[in-house]
From Swiss-Prot:
Keywords: Membrane, Transmembrane, Transmembrane helix. It holds the Pfam family TMEM101. The keyword rRNA-binding does not apply. Coiled coil: none annotated. It is a multi-pass membrane protein. GO terms for cellular component: membrane. It comes from the Eukaryota. It is found in: Membrane. The chain crosses the membrane at residues 24-40, 52-72, 77-97, 110-130, 139-159, 182-202, 206-226, 233-253. InterPro entries: TMEM101. This is Transmembrane protein 101.
Amino acid sequence: MASKIGSRRWMLQLIMQLGSVLLTRCPFWGCFSQLMLYAERAEARRKPDIPVPYLYFDMGAAVLCASFMSFGVKRRWFALGAALQLAISTYTAYIGGYVHYGDWLKVRMYSRTVAIIGGFLVLASGAGELYRRKPRSRSLQSTGQVFLGIYLICVAYSLQHSKEDRLAYLNHLPGGELMVQLFFVLYGVLALAFLSGYYVTLAAQILAVLLPPVMLLIDGNVSYWHNTRRVEFWNQMKLLGESVGIFGAAVILATDG
């Protein structure tokens, strides 16, 4: 009996570490995909989302925070720093107005950013640590969960009001309209759980099971988004990487919530 409990605990710790790896490495992929995206825009003489002098500082801060988080050095502080950096970066890009996106694409982009910020706040609370030397900050974790709940509300909203998202689910998932409505209900229920703070571990477990097929069939269908919906290739790759980071945050809450 004791060996079964020990093996189960070891497996949960292994899965939790996997979630931490996916979330803490997310900024590296974000910086790489941004560089590739802005290089493509430079060839077409189009501007990046953030002016170039500030862009280098922004990416430097992201890489610095991601590096320290990855090595586990002052992870809580640098997770908080990563959340702050991402929030400032997104706000700067939004008010800059250098690039104009469709409303449906803005929802896809900014909702994922909100979720990643929430994931970093969960990490900053002390969740996902193998050997916790300090008590966990429940306020930071609750705030991170609220951010994840907001992301799920945005996804549910897009399923009902975004033609692009609805067609992605209708064309690439079996079950047609029934499956779309099922996902809508699931996202809504999970959002309520994260926002209210009740059954968070169970909600995170369901989300961790739900996200991989969605990432593979919806976000991973680059040809649909790039060729049909005219989303820039590296922008879609950035969104896909953020979905992986959100999955990592869900795994952390599912195993250490």
